[in-house]
Amino acid sequence: BZIBYKMGHFRWGAPMDK
């Protein structure tokens, strides 16, 4: 989810800074 990006979660095993 988009909220995961904002929380800085690494959903795909990589840091997502979106």
From Swiss-Prot:
InterPro entries: Mcrtin_ACTH_cent
A GO CC term attached to the entry: extracellular region
Keyword Secreted included in the entry's annotation: yes
Highest taxon, organism lineage: Eukaryota
Main location: secreted
UniProt-annotated location(s): Secreted
Keywords: Hormone, Secreted
Any one GO molecular function term: hormone activity
The keyword Secreted appears for this protein: yes
Family: Belongs to the POMC family.
Task of the protein: MSH (melanocyte-stimulating hormone) increases the pigmentation of skin by increasing melanin production in melanocytes.
Protein name from the UniProt record: Melanotropin beta
Organism (species): Scyliorhinus canicula (Small-spotted catshark)
